[in-house]
Amino acid sequence: MNLEEKQLTSEYIYNGKIIKLRRDTALLPNGKTSTREVIEHNGGVCVAALTDSDEVLFVKQFRYPFGKILTELPAGKLDSPDEDPLEAAKRELKEETGYSADTWTYLGVYYPTVAYTDEKIYIYMARDLHRGTQHLDEDEFLHFYNVPIESLIEDIKNDKIPDGKTQLGILKAARLFGY
């Protein structure tokens, strides 16, 4: 069974600082055409940083699209499509929390919204942490703190953590440690 679509035309209709929006015409498997709107994004990283006492570094920050403060794992965007995700993860952990790590484990890639964006989020676990100084971007305001991993698993079960990348990062890291 053929399920693939083929791009026939493509035009950029918005070119922003973080995203580009394009409108494509696609040939469908049944021979008809359809319009596809695609948000292009460089991608991002998410870090489940665990202390020696199995606490997770967590951040609180205001998320403008939702109009509220959310709790998340440290995360950020790739500066370019070809940036090494591990290097971006190290940078984001350092910027947002001040911490660096000696041990990094790749936990996988997450496609947050497969229907209309090509964004990928690379998820890492960081261990053997060393505390340093936060270096937030000038337009970034957040607070970081430590939370026991067991309580985060309960928070996910009870719908207290709505962010998908954070849920996935916590659950993948917890699985490695038998939680």
Regions found by a protein language model. Give the residues of each.
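Residue-level detector of beta-propeller blades
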Residues: 7-8, 106
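Conserved Nudix-box catalytic region and its N-terminal flanking loop in Nudix hydrolases
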Residues: 2, 46, 51-91
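Unchanged
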Residues: 34, 43-46, 77-164
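Short glycine/serine/proline-enriched coil/turn segments at secondary-structure junctions
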Residues: 16, 65, 113-116
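Charged phosphate-binding loop/patch that engages nucleotide di/tri-phosphates or the phosphate backbone
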Residues: 166-179
